[in-house]
UniProtKB/Swiss-Prot annotation:
An example Gene Ontology CC term for this record: plasma membrane
Main location: plastid
Species name: Arabidopsis thaliana
Outcome of gene disruption: Malfunction of the NDH complex.
Protein name as it appears in the record: NAD(P)H-quinone oxidoreductase subunit O, chloroplastic
Keywords: Chloroplast, Membrane, NAD, NADP, Plastid, Plastoquinone, Quinone, Thylakoid, Transit peptide, Translocase, Transport
GO BP terms: NADH dehydrogenase complex (plastoquinone) assembly
Length: 158
């Protein structure tokens, strides 16, 4: 019964909509002439600007696109590094962690087992993402000025 009531309501709506005038059911395309007028006005503006620009200098209108230069890094990815102990202990990286006064950092960061995973230039300077080989810890972003380049990886698995 509910289905038959719904069908009868739909059929009554269709008879009401068919009795309405056509102009109220369909929206006329009033915006179409406005777009053509705007396009014609823009063409006129461009033609007047083209004449004035053509008289001034045609080379000034064509400017080559310059791509941003790639930054030059002091290190490269995959390079083996170690952290300079004195610079690290006096840095904001060490002081912001809140270590106790007697704590002098983890020994493995001062050994030749750090690998540069990524390099970025931030507002505060050039930083390297350093991961330590054989140490199950997360990599850390450290300033490149406190890193010392090493020739080879000095690491013995225990």
């Amino acid at each position: 019964m509910a289905f038959s009531a719904t069908v009868s309501q739909l059929s009554s709506l269709s008879t009401i909509s068919s009795s309405l005038p056509i102009s109220s059911r369909r929206l006329p395309h009033r915006s179409l002439p406005q777009f053509t007028v705007k396009a014609e006005a823009e063409k006129e503006k461009q033609s007047t600007q083209g004449k004035s620009d053509g008289e001034a200098s045609p080379a000034a209108t064509k400017t080559p696109k310059t791509l941003p230069k790639k930054p030059v890094y002091s290190m490269k990815k995959g390079q083996i590094v170690r952290v300079e102990k004195e610079k690290y202990l006096n840095s904001i990286n060490y002081l912001s962690v809140g270590h106790p006064p007697f704590y002098k950092g983890l020994d493995y960061i001062y050994e030749d087992r750090g690998e540069v995973l990524d390099l970025r230039v931030f507002e505060t300077g050039e930083y390297a993402l350093v991961g330590w080989v054989g140490i199950p810890t997360a990599p850390a972003w450290l300033p490149t000025d406190m890193l010392i380049k090493c020739e080879k990886l000095v690491y013995e698995r225990m």
